[in-house]
């Protein structure tokens, strides 16, 4: 399908099928479509409303081009789309560390900040973790600790090709949606936070098509109803659960899990150094109750998605124990020490 045909289809307001979208993305990544046409395609996809098939097709193309890394089917990713402008600290990163200490295998795919002061890569780097480990080093780290951080630019070098077009457009495109779906370890278990409720069904279907075995797609609200791309302890959380190809929907509030409701201002983040200190204090047992419960809630969902907990309530108990016994702090210290040793042995992925 030539790019002129793709443009004709999109200009008519029609959707691309999954195979058509895959061929389109293949052509973009192969340099077979000029930048001006790429810009038009991305704009029209956004204008028409991106479909689950289009997301699934684009994902398939990009995953095939990712630098491969093999972990195992137990691995869980905790990530969000970003874009909520709420300015919270790195809740999903803190949750990943707590869940890992509670026995959950974590393969966290992340990047530097786009809409906030501090992304997952920023805060982990500030905590002392080498974020650009060679894939062999990351695999070894995962085998020893059950934790891996997969730095997106390292595993998706082909994405550089569209960076200038995306920057010149200055709008959200399908690439902003694809991030949480592009874990190079091809994880089968995910907690995905989305900033816009209309994206929930799209993610659920795209994850189903990718072979995901268990995922929770969550959209939170602040106390005033503003959007959050994570499970909320400030208001309601809307959830779509995907398990064994079946989806169900429900809405929760913090008190359903014996958590308090906190103002979103109590979860404010800052610079990478400030957020790293906040997470350290959280793992030391010195954070505020609001910060603690926000991280516990997300960690509990990760425990549930992993299969280690039978429900979110049980996950909260597991996460609380990991914090109370300082296991999460000791675990982070071990991850940092081992990863530095492995960096010396294998070098970085840029080598």
From Swiss-Prot:
Binding site for Mg(2+) 1: 92, 230
UniProt: anthranilate 2 binding residues: 166
Superkingdom, natural source: Bacteria
Cofactor, free-text remark: Binds 2 magnesium ions per monomer.
Residues involved in 5-phospho-alpha-D-ribose 1-diphosphate binding: 80, 83-84, 88, 90-93, 108-116, 120
Cofactors that this protein relies on: Mg(2+)
Binding locations of anthranilate 1: 80, 111
Reaction equation(s) it catalyzes: N-(5-phospho-beta-D-ribosyl)anthranilate + diphosphate = 5-phospho-alpha-D-ribose 1-diphosphate + anthranilate
Secretion signal, residue range per the UniProt entry: none
Binding-site residues, Mg(2+) 2: 229-230
Keywords: Amino-acid biosynthesis, Aromatic amino acid biosynthesis, Glycosyltransferase, Magnesium, Metal-binding, Transferase, Tryptophan biosynthesis
EC number(s) per entry: 2.4.2.18
Pathway: Amino-acid biosynthesis; L-tryptophan biosynthesis; L-tryptophan from chorismate: step 2/5
GO biological process, one term: L-tryptophan biosynthetic process
HAMAP family: TrpD
Function: Catalyzes the transfer of the phosphoribosyl group of 5-phosphorylribose-1-pyrophosphate (PRPP) to anthranilate to yield N-(5'-phosphoribosyl)-anthranilate (PRA).
Protein name according to UniProt: Anthranilate phosphoribosyltransferase
Native species: Chlorobium phaeovibrioides (strain DSM 265 / 1930)
């Amino acid at each position: 399908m030539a790019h002129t045909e793709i443009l004709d289809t999109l200009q008519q307001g029609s959707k691309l099928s999954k195979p058509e979208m895959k061929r389109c993305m293949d052509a973009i990544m192969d340099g077979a479509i000029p930048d001006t046409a790429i810009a038009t395609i991305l704009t029209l996809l956004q204008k028409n409303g991106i479909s689950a098939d289009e997301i699934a097709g684009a994902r398939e193309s990009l995953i095939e081009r990712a630098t491969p890394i093999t972990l195992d089917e137990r691995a869980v990713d905790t990530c969000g789309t970003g874009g909520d402008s709420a300015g919270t600290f790195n809740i999903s990163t803190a949750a990943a560390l707590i869940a890992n200490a509670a026995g959950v295998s974590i393969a966290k795919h992340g990047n530097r900040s786009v809409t906030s002061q501090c992304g997952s890569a920023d805060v982990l780097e500030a905590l002392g973790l080498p974020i650009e480990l060679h894939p062999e080093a990351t695999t070894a780290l995962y085998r020893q600790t059950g934790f891996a951080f997969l730095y997106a630019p390292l595993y998706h070098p082909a994405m550089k090709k569209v960076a200038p077009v995306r920057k010149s457009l200055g709008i959200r495109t399908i690439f902003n949606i694809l991030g949480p779906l592009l874990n190079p370890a091809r994880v089968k278990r995910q907690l995905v936070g989305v900033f816009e409720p209309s994206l929930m069904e799209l993610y659920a279907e795209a994850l189903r098509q990718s072979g995901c075995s268990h995922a929770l797609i969550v959209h939170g609200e602040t106390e005033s109803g503003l959007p959050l791309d994570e499970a909320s302890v400030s208001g309601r959380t809307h959830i779509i659960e995907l398990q064994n190809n079946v989806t169900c929907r429900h809405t929760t509030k913090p008190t359903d899990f014996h958590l308090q409701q906190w103002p979103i201002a109590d979860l404010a983040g800052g610079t990478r150094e400030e957020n790293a200190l906040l997470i350290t204090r959280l793992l030391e047992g010195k954070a505020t109750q609001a910060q603690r419960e926000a991280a516990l809630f997300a960690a509990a969902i990760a425990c549930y998605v992993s299969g280690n907990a039978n429900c979110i309530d049980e996950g909260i108990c597991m996460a609380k124990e990991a914090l109370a016994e300082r296991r999460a702090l000791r675990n982070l210290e071990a991850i940092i020490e081992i990863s530095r040793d492995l960096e010396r042995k294998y070098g970085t992925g840029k080598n």
